[in-house]
Amino acid sequence: MASLVPCPNCGRRPKEEFTIKGAALSRPEADADSIDWFDYVYLRENPRGAYEEYWHHTSGCRRWLVVARDTVTHEIAACCDAAGRARSEARK
């Protein structure tokens, strides 16, 4: 049985419809120093357990999503629209 991703726009869809683009990190402010930017661009964790990633629904709604999954079991805990999440974080 294929793994299903709970797309907030299309419903449960096979993982093959998505392209994983990497960690869902908070971007440094535009005026951040070069060390912060270096860390953001080049340094990545390789965690075991819960992890958030950007996924693109390339064969569906073509929206960017933030998928929370376990890197050991690959179980998906949550999925939300990346644009909506960015707006909610900006209000904080």
Curated annotation (Swiss-Prot):
GO biological process, one term: tetrahydrofolate metabolic process
Binding-site list for Zn(2+): 7, 10, 57, 61
Enzyme class: oxidoreductase
One Gene Ontology molecular-function label: sarcosine oxidase activity
Annotated localization: Cytoplasm
Coiled coil: none
E.C. code: 1.5.3.24
Catalytic activity: sarcosine + (6S)-5,6,7,8-tetrahydrofolate + O2 = (6R)-5,10-methylene-5,6,7,8-tetrahydrofolate + glycine + H2O2; sarcosine + O2 + H2O = formaldehyde + glycine + H2O2
Major localization class: cytoplasm
Family membership: Belongs to the SoxD family.
Assembly mode: Heterotetramer composed of subunits alpha (SoxA), beta (SoxB), gamma (SoxG) and delta (SoxD).
Protein name as catalogued: Sarcosine oxidase subunit delta
Gene name of this polypeptide: soxD
